[in-house]
Amino acid sequence: MEILMHEMSNGQETSTVDTKIYTINKQSTKKIENTQIKDEERLMKTDLMDTIDIVFENITYTVSLGCRKGQKEILHGINGRLPAKHLIALMGPSGAGKSTLLNILSGFRTTGVDGNININGHAREINSFRKCSAYITQDDRLEALLTVNENMTVAADLKLPTSTPRYEKEAIIEEILTILGLREHMNTQTGRLSGGQKKRLSIALELVNNPTVMFLDEPTTGLDSLSCTQVINLLKLLARQGRTIICTIHQPSATIFQLFDLVYILSKGECLFHGSTDHLVSYLENIKLPCPVYYNPADYVIELACGEYGEDKISLLVSAAENGKNLQWFKNSNTLLESNGLKTLHSHKNLNINNRNSLQATPVIHQIKILMKRGFLMCKRDTTLTHLRILANIAVGLMLGLVFLESGTDGARVLSNYNLLFSILIHHMMTTMMLTVVTFPMQMNILLKEHFNRWYSLKAFYTALSLVDLPLSIFCCLIFTLLVYFITSQPLEMSRFLMFFSISLLVVLISQGFGLMIGAICNVIPIFVKF
């Protein structure tokens, strides 16, 4: 694994930024050095009673096509066994159902699903299972303005109990980054990392709380061959330490394919093969579909799954695999425990996943504090939007003030005052709402990933988002109110001015809430991407 400990000399250029908010002081460093080795080993390893075997039976998934078109079945009664300490690939052509199955197993998708999913012989309790698992998406959903160390610190503060000492959190971060080969980039902004480094950082963030099961959607997409090998080797190492690692992959090279322990091949929602990668060639020979000499078995089986050799071959493969029930192609298949054996080995008493406390590891107040800290830091580093908001309020305030110049002192211009108030209302509503509608969807992907992986609750995120934006909203509203109020010669009474300002601020805050709602429902980002 030396390749994971050193970066390529010709990698992308990196730069460092100010990290005053998240720094490791000398006292903490001394404590890290004195931390016992046993504690560090405990971080990256799971014992026998913590390992998780996943068994799914007769899984079907249907989607609605509308009132007139009825429903369509995506997965057709598939079965499978995903044992612990294995790196498992869900493989198949586009549209085979790989990502759908991954989402169902992880609990990311629950509606329209039928069948049984058992964890260590017991029926899966979705909220309990989520506490010991992590889901890593295909695209790297990271805060680009934060450094590697800052991202890791936020993850540690949110995912580890508040009783965990700071020096222990720093020891965990340092160990993970060292193992993943990111330690020398701790002070590098995430946006300046290479694709492989971002993928490893995505994995590192979820390793903070040491999950037992990890789901990864297309972890090698967009990476070069060396980065692919680094990522898969890393996943294999994590699996050897006791985790169950499940990832989708489209069409791996022969080298990458051999790194997987088990492969689950799908085609049109059915299982074609379920077993060891070493036994795939033997399986194909056994059903009279031998892989040509010097041919990548992964390429050949994908061609079979696509129907290039006829639809009858797909039916033959599904029949031979018994739609996932046939486990004879596992290594040491005779030693696999049945459901009763798994129940005995992993009793409810010893399973961490049956803890039904809150999904998040920290209280809501602590989550709000950490999210506000992150939000203010990002605002500090990206001042473009802040400057634009201030300039927009100054420009519109001057324009309205000049249009309705001294209308407040002229009794004959009551209608002009009404028009002024209406214009102010429209300005506060539209500028605030449209700004939120456009910018909030950019945060949605990160929100979905972090919330599903139990970093924080939705109420904590909304509260922190509102509080971070509140000082700027007050400042912009105050500037606008001062310009309009005095240029239009409104009555110079403190009570009237405070009432005018308070109502304006309330309109701004309400508009921001509506903007968040509309931005969450109607994601406008794809529209801008098209144009």
Q: Which residues are covered by each model-predicted region?
A:
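Topological signature of polytopic alpha-helical transporters
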Residues: 1-79, 84, 93, 119, ...
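Conserved ABC ATPase signature
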Residues: 189-193
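Membrane-spanning alpha-helical segments of multipass transporters and channels
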Residues: 272, 286-289, 381-531
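Hydrophobic anchor residue at the start of the ABC signature
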Residues: 203, 231
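Conserved ABC transporter NBD signature motif
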Residues: 80-83, 106-107, 113-125, 129-131
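ABC ATPase C-loop
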Residues: 206-207
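Conserved catalytic motifs of ABC-family nucleotide-binding domains
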Residues: 127, 140-150, 163-164
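Catalytic Walker B motif of ABC-type/P-loop ATPase nucleotide-binding domains
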Residues: 214-218
